[in-house]
Structures are given as C-alpha cells and as structure tokens.
Design a protein with these regions (language model features):
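Metal-dependent amide/peptide-bond hydrolase catalytic core
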Residues: 4, 10, 14, 19, ...
Length: 206
C-alpha cells in the first residue's frame, strides 16, 4: 500500500528566532523513531502476523537558516494479510500524528500532518493445484529441473493479473541482491528461465 505524508511545520529564522519555528523534519524524525522503536518499520513481526514497511523518499527544506516548514515523505506497507497491512498503515499514521502533537513553538503553535494511502495491488497465493501452477511445474520438470514453489514478497504484474481473474505464476530468473549495490544476475539461471519461458510459450525446448 503506497503512502504519502506531508508534514507542515512553521518557518522562522533558525538563528534569530528558532523558538518561533516548528521543524517539519523534527516531527518526521520523532515519528520515524517511534516506528522503529515499536517495531513498525522494516520487517514487522507481531505475534503470528508479519509484514514490512519502508520510508523510501524524503524531500523538504529551503535553506539552512530557515526552520524547515514542510517535508514530504513517501512510504509503503506490505503484508500477505490484508487486515495486518491496514494495521501497519494505521500505526504509521498514528506515529506521525503523535509526533506533530509533541512539538510546539514559543507561542504554543504546533505543526500538522496530512496523510494519504492507496492500495496499488493486493497480495495473493495460488493453490498448488491451480492449472497455471501445474502447467509451470510441468514445463520446469520437462527441462530436467526441480520446481520449487515459493511466496514472493515483491509486487508483480501477477498481482494485477490474478486480481482480474487470470491466475498467474511468476518464474525466478536468476536475480540476487535485488535493489542493493550487490545486485547481480546469475546467467545460467537466467538462461534456464528463458528455456522455461520458451517452453510455456511455444511448446519448444530450443
């Protein structure tokens, strides 16, 4: 679930009148610290429930001599359990709202938070008996490989296709260390995936 958060502080001169300002980045920092300390950022495990959240974009500020008046953040929440994903979103919202209430300037004024969330795709899991799963399994086995069924925590075209009535399998293609500086592609695995794709598309093996 995609999340956008606008934090509104109060601008003031950071040298002459810092007490008159409310820092938007200070509000966001308190909120993020709250989420981390209480286990609602990164990998989330609460009892039997699991999920993840991430704040991946932060933008704001005008100059070093201005108490930051506004800050925009973009985040996301994930879980294979719809209700738990909604809980994660709720906890993120509450953390930012609490943080905004904690800070005030010399005049007693506080900043504010605007919060939006939008479900980009729903999670899904296919039965091993699903026809598309059986077809993919057969293609892998026909090429002398052993299929391994896994649940993926990424967002895929398969999410949309399955949601629209087309049960869809995604095949591994040799990626490793995704979205890191160590990201790599194992060529042998990639070529195996190409062979499976060709088999599924044409019935041919080469």
């Amino acid at each position: 679930e995609a999340i956008e958060i606008d934090v509104e502080g109060i601008a003031s001169h950071a040298g002459a009148h810092p007490q008159d300002g409310v820092s938007a980045v200070a509000i966001a920092s308190l909120a993020i610290s709250d989420l981390v300390e209480n286990g609602w950022h990164g990998l989330i495990q609460k009892g039997r429930n699991t999920g993840a959240s991430n704040i991946g974009f932060v933008s704001g500020g005008e100059a070093t001599n201005v108490v930051m008046p506004n800050l925009k953040l973009k985040a996301e929440a994930r879980s294979h359990d719809m209700k738990f994903r909604e809980r994660i979103v709720k906890e993120i919202r509450k953390a930012f709202e609490r943080a905004a209430k904690k800070l005030k300037n010399a005049a007693g004024q506080r900043g504010s938070v605007s919060f939006w969330s939008d479900l980009k795709y729903e999670s899904f899991a296919l039965s091993p008996k699903e026809e598309s799963v059986q077809t993919a399994r057969a293609a892998v086995e026909s090429l002398g490989m052993e299929p391994e069924l896994r649940i993926c925590n990424g967002g895929l075209d398969a999410n949309w296709m399955t949601a629209h009535g087309i049960p869809t399998v995604t095949l591994g293609c040799g990626q490793d260390g995704i979205h890191t500086v160590n990201e790599r592609l194992y060529i042998d695995s990639f070529l195996q995936a190409c062979a499976v794709g060709l088999k599924l598309a044409t019935g041919q093996e080469s």
